[in-house]
Every structure is written in structure tokens, then in C-alpha cells.
Regions:
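Short, surface-exposed connector motifs at secondary-structure boundaries
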Residues: 4-7, 81-82, 100-107, 127-128, ...
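Glycine-rich nucleotide phosphate-binding loop and flanking beta-alpha elements
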Residues: 19, 93-94, 115-116
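Structural motif
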Residues: 9, 31-35, 62, 84-85, ...
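Rossmann-fold NAD(P) dinucleotide-binding segment
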Residues: 73-83, 91-108
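Short glycine-/small-residue-rich Rossmann-like dinucleotide-binding loops
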Residues: 87-91, 113
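Adenosine-phosphate binding glycine-rich loop
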Residues: 106-183
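Glycine-rich phosphate/diphosphate-binding loop of Rossmann-like nucleotide-binding domains
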Residues: 1-80
Length: 183
């Protein structure tokens, strides 16, 4: 993407375990959440969505769609958000071939399992949209389970997840660049 996380805009598809943690992490790093979805729909706010307030709304009402002042849309619209980064964190087969030309994000991180086919990933690659594959990006659950198994605490878990995913992402992206292929 060539842009630092601080100041980048992002959207998160799915606001469960993966979605809430990635939102917390990115907002703490200085990124700006513009859109988020859950099973009830998608919200968009160009001024940005406040993470603590979003968590409060979800805990009190059961859904992110009750966030005040946000524009509410069908959940599937999340992939068309005008953001730098799109995080998929819920459903499989989210991005279809017909969606490719309307995607505005320059980086897609597959936090969910199989959010698109390899054919879609190739089409996105041809549009210079970087896709971090699901087998790299959503390994956090396995790493977390390992840390729990060895008796580690939450701090150790987050540190190890960050280290391993960052390292593995760099390896996959460097290999793709070297071999002139998509990750």
C-alpha cells in the first residue's frame, strides 16, 4: 500500500472477535474507522467512527447499526467503502468477480476464511490491490490457542500474534513480489 497505518482509513466486515480486535488495534495505531458491518447491516461515517463508542453501542443494543449519526446500508455494501484498507472478518465468499471494479481499498486483509476465490484475488492483483491471504492474516486464533495452552497471559498472546502475523505477512508478500505473482 505504501502508506503508514497512522492516518489510513479502514472498513471492517464483521464485528465479532476478529473485527473488534482489529478495530481496536488499528485505531490505537492511528488509523480511522469509516465503515463497519455486522449481521444487521453496515454503517458509514466519513468523519470516522469512535471505537469505544461503537463498542458501547454494540454492548447496549446488540448491533453496530444503532451507532448515532452514521449512514446505515446493507451489510454487503462494506466492500465498496471508500477506504485505504478493507478487513474481512466474518463471512466466506464475500467478494465476487462482479465486485472487483467497484472496490476502492488498496489493501484487503482476509481476516475471515475464504472471503474470495483465487480468481478474484488475481483480478484484484491486476488492479494493484494488495490482498493479504486468509491463511496468513487469520492465524491469530491458532496462535492465541497455543499461548493459552502454554499458560501465557493476554499480553504475551497479543505480542506473539503480532510478531508471527507480521513476520509471516512479510515472508508471503516478499515471495509474491520476488516471483511476480499475487500472494
Amino acid at each position: 500500500m505504501g502508506k503508514p497505518v497512522e492516518g489510513a482509513t479502514f472498513a471492517v466486515e464483521g464485528f465479532g472477535n476478529v473485527g473488534t480486535f482489529v478495530t481496536k488495534f488499528l485505531t490505537e495505531a492511528g488509523a480511522k474507522l469509516l465503515a463497519v458491518s455486522d449481521s444487521k447491516g453496515c454503517i458509514y461515517l466519513k468523519e470516522g467512527i469512535d471505537y469505544p463508542k461503537l463498542m458501547e453501542v454494540k454492548e447496549k443494543t446488540g448491533s453496530i447499526i444503532n451507532y448515532p449519526a452514521a449512514k446505515t446500508e446493507p451489510g454487503s455494501n462494506i466492500i465498496h467503502a471508500n477506504v485505504d484498507i478493507l478487513i474481512t472478518a466474518a463471512i466466506p465468499d464475500l467478494v465476487k468477480t462482479g465486485d472487483v471494479n467497484s472496490i476502492k481499498a488498496k489493501l484487503i486483509v482476509e481476516g475471515s476464511n475464504i472471503p474470495m476465490t483465487e480468481q478474484v484475488e488475481i483480478l484484484l492483483h491486476k488492479k494493484n490491490i494488495l490482498v493479504v491471504p486468509d491463511f496468513v492474516a487469520n492465524a491469530g486464533g491458532v496462535i492465541s490457542s497455543y499461548v493459552e495452552y502454554i499458560g501465557g497471559d493476554e499480553k504475551k498472546m497479543f505480542k506473539l500474534v503480532e510478531e508471527k502475523i507480521k513476520k509471516n505477512t512479510e515472508i508471503v508478500l516478499d515471495s509474491a513480489k520476488k516471483n511476480k505473482t499475487h500472494p
